[in-house]
């Protein structure tokens, strides 16, 4: 009877998590008690998985600040441990029915029994074994099962970690894609806003010009009307006056009448006006996609100083500008400014040697009235060429470049014609907006060099095809006589 009571008491003070006697018991509002260590671990796991804590038994949510130590249960546990350690406590290992030691294990019923139970009708004919033998064999099996479960637990934790990592990776990727989509559409909106602003400015300029001319024409018409009105008044006065007044200077009046010619006002036919057409969104999207695609190959380009170029280079190796003109004193102390040969002397190569792949970079040429940029397959101008006429700037000499002159004339330099092979063939480029920033895309395997007008939303300026890259090529910059620097843009700019 006493052993049964002890069993019931033990069940009441056993932790539902670790199934051992409670250690430093803590109680929740729902009345369930747990070991302090077990409840703490369960709380951390629940917060990580669900974002809130709940009782492991009844699943009722609780607040950590409402947890309280249960000293009454702690005292019961302590007393129970004392009973188990005392001689009286050892009676728990005896049969509750017969009072004999529990030394046998019934295989059929899975119970520990005494020798009198073995002979009873309840266990007659069952297979029984000594508890020590069964315990040893059972311990081996349970130990193996425990190891297997621990391995399964480790695998489960690894799978859990993998899925969390995959979840985080997907979240990061989607967020990155969202950012790119927002940036792309923002850029498209900027393009449309620019087109709208530009079109409105054109209309305002047209309105200002036409109204100005119409106002001038209106003034002339007012003056013309006033002149005719004065002549009519003079004639009416003569007709109403005396004969003397009528005939006095009549020839001059008649001559004035004959010379009256009405000047027609200047008109502006509306049917000849430039008709507004919405931007070619499809074309703009294609240009935008092409620029977005080539920008994936953006490389961080800097210049490589050398003894050949006289260009002035900044400390960060990104800005290139032309040197100051030299002062030469002539006869009788006369001062002359002389520029060195800026066609080639100020040219400089990028530090990156390109032998394969796709490469893209951008150059800031804002506020410059002259520049040359592109790709060069070496920095050795042919001494037989007339450098003043840009004869070296030809693909056959290893230059695939475009340039700007006088702030508005944009050109590409191609190989000379059959009749004038030494002089480059200058290809005038039609650019609606003069570029302040130029993108250069080199596809080594495709043998192409493309130039993009970043200022005008990335529209293609010019493209060299079928380039002969028989050796390493380099980015090329030449600020020419304009002392405003050219700047190699970083990929993050």
Curated annotation (Swiss-Prot):
PROSITE patterns: B302_SPRY (PS50188), ZF_BBOX (PS50119), ZF_RING_1 (PS00518), ZF_RING_2 (PS50089). Residues 185-198 are annotated as: Required for interaction with GABARAP and for autophagy. Zn(2+) binds at residues 95, 98, 117, 123. Degraded in a proteasome-independent fashion in the absence of viral infection but in a proteasome-dependent fashion following exposure to restriction sensitive virus. Autoubiquitinated in a RING finger- and UBE2D2-dependent manner. Monoubiquitinated by TRIM21. Deubiquitinated by Yersinia YopJ. Ubiquitination may not lead to proteasomal degradation. This is Tripartite motif-containing protein 5. Residues 281-493 form the B30.2/SPRY domain. The modification N-acetylalanine is found at residue 2. It catalyses: S-ubiquitinyl-[E2 ubiquitin-conjugating enzyme]-L-cysteine + [acceptor protein]-L-lysine = [E2 ubiquitin-conjugating enzyme]-L-cysteine + N(6)-ubiquitinyl-[acceptor protein]-L-lysine. The B box-type zinc finger domain and the coiled-coil domain contribute to the higher and low order multimerization respectively which is essential for restriction activity. The coiled coil domain is important for higher order multimerization by promoting the initial dimerization. Its main location: cytoplasm. GO terms for cellular component: cytoplasm; nucleus; P-body. It is found in: Cytoplasm; Nucleus. Can form homodimers and homotrimers. In addition to lower-order dimerization, also exhibits a higher-order multimerization and both low- and high-order multimerizations are essential for its restriction activity. Interacts with BTBD1 and BTBD2. Interacts with PSMC4, PSMC5, PSMD7 and HSPA8/HSC70. Interacts (via B30.2/SPRY domain) with HSPA1A/B. Interacts with PSMC2, MAP3K7/TAK1, TAB2 and TAB3. Interacts with SQSTM1. Interacts with TRIM6 and TRIM34. Interacts with ULK1 (phosphorylated form), GABARAP, GABARAPL1, GABARAPL2, MAP1LC3A, MAP1LC3C and BECN1. A zinc finger (RING-type) spans 15-59. The gene is TRIM5. The modification Phosphoserine is found at residue 86. A zinc finger (B box-type) spans 90-132. Capsid-specific restriction factor that prevents infection from non-host-adapted retroviruses. Blocks viral replication early in the life cycle, after viral entry but before reverse transcription. In addition to acting as a capsid-specific restriction factor, also acts as a pattern recognition receptor that activates innate immune signaling in response to the retroviral capsid lattice. Residues 131-240 form a coiled coil. Its EC number is 2.3.2.27. Pathway: Protein modification; protein ubiquitination. Belongs to the TRIM/RBCC family.
